[in-house]
Amino acid sequence: MQVDELLKPFPIKEFHPFPRALLGPGAHEMIGPEALKLGFKKTLVMTSGLRGSDIVHKITESMKYHGLEVVLYDKVESNPKDYNVMDAVKLYQENKCDSFVSIGGGSSHDACKGARISVAHDGRNVNDFEGFNKSENPRNPPHIAVSTTAGTGSETSWAYVITDTTTDPDNPHKYVAFDDASVATLAIDDPVLYYSCPIDYTAQCGFDVLAHASEPYVSRLNFEPSLGNALRAIKLTAENLRQATWNPSELSGREGMMYAQYIAAQAFNSGGLGIIHSISHAVSAFYDTHHGLNNAIALPRVWAFNMPVAYKRFADMAEAMGVDTHGMTDVQAADALAAAIRLLRDVGIPEKFTDVTQDSYSKNRLGQGPTKFYEQASVIKGDDEDVDRITNHVLGDACTPGNAKECTFETVRPVVDHCMNGDLDDLLS
C-alpha cells in the first residue's frame, strides 16, 4: 500500500509474508546446517559487533565448521545509517559473497535487509528504495536473521528502517521501507542469546514489543488476522518483561519475551503501526537515541491520545495487561494506560525525552568507535523548535496514516511536547 492510499478508508486489506522460523533454546546452533541447505557458500555477516559478548564469534565459528566462508561487517550502528548499508554492500561485492547473515537486533537486521535490496539492484543507493515495494527485482541473496534481542521483530517482518544522512546532512531523515522482497529467508529466535543483552536494553526492547502489539490492535487498518496475535503479545509482554529485566538469567522471562516479539511483529506486519513509531523515528533521526527507548516514552502519550476513539480496544488491552475489568464499562475498563505506566516505571525507563542522556541507554550497543554519526547525538532539547521539527517529521512518516486517531500538526504537536517535557501522572488525572 502507498501512503496516499493509507489516508483513505481501507476497503482492501493486504497480508504480507513472514519467513520460516526456528524458535527456542538452542535454535542458533542450527545456523550452519540451515545455511548449507539454502546454498550458502560465502556469507557476509552483518552485526553491530555485540561488544561485551562472544555471540558473533561462536556463530561465525560454527558456520566455518560447516564449511562456509565468512566475511564480517561489524560496524552497523544503532538506527542504521545509509552509509552502514552501502559500506556493507561494497564489502559484499568486493568479496563476491552469495548470502547474508545478520546477528543482533533490529539495527543489524534492517541494515542487512537494505543491503540485500541494494545488492539485488547492482549496488544502487539504499535510499532509493524508501517507500512501499520500491524494489524492482524480487530475487535477492538469501538471508538468515539471528536475533539477540526481544524487540523489533525485524527478523520476521517486511519492513526495514534506515537513517538517511546524505540527502540533507543537517536534517537526517529516518524512514521505513516496506518491501516484500526484504523478508528474511529464515528467522532464528533463541532466548539463550538474550542473556548477554543489558538490563536497560532488555526493558527498552520490551516496550518496542508493546508498541508493535498495541498499534495494530487499534490501527485504522483494523486487520482481523492481526488482532489475536496483537492481544496475545500484549499479554505476554505484561507477564514476562519484569521477569526478563529483574532476573535476566532466568529462561522463562526471556522465552516469554521471545514469543511476544515474534507474534507482535506478525501482528504489525500486516496490521500496521501508528505515531508511537512515527515519534520514535523522528527523535532517533535527530538524536540517535535507541528505538525501544523512544517507543517507551511515546507509548503512554499516544495511548492517551488514541483512547477516545478506541475505548473497547483499550479495555481489551487493559485486561490483557492484568487489569480486573469485571463489571466495568469500556470507558472505565480502558485502564491499559495506567498499567503501561506502572510497567515503564517498574523496569526503570526514563519518563520523558528531556530526561534522556547518553547514559540512558547501553553504549556498547550504539556502534561507538569508528562511526561518522554518533558524535551528533546529544542531550535532547525539547524546546519549541525541537517540538515543531519532530512534529513535522511525524506527519511525514509512513506509519502515521495507520494511527487510530487522525493526525494533524495541531493535534500531534501537544503529544510530542508532552513526550519531551510532560509528567506521566498528568495522563492519569
UniProtKB/Swiss-Prot annotation:
Consequence of gene loss (knockout): Cells lacking this gene are unable to grow methanol, ethanol, propan-1-ol and butan-1-ol, but are still able to grow on formaldehyde.
Entry's pH dependence statement: Optimum pH is between 4.5 and 5.
Entry-linked CDD domains: LPO (cd08176)
Catalytic activity: methanol + A = formaldehyde + AH2
Functional summary from the UniProt entry: Catalyzes the oxidation of methanol to yield formaldehyde. While the in vivo electron acceptor is not known, N,N-dimethyl-4-nitrosoaniline (NDMA) can serve this function in vitro and is reduced to 4-(hydroxylamino)-N,N-dimethylaniline. It can also use various other primary alcohols, polyols and formaldehyde. In addition, MNO is able to produce methylformate from methanol plus formaldehyde, and possesses a formaldehyde dismutase and a NADH-dependent formaldehyde reductase activity.
Protein family (similarity comment): Belongs to the iron-containing alcohol dehydrogenase family.
Protein name: Methanol:N,N-dimethyl-4-nitrosoaniline oxidoreductase
Originating species: Amycolatopsis methanolica
Higher taxonomy: Bacteria, Bacillati, Actinomycetota, Actinomycetes, Pseudonocardiales
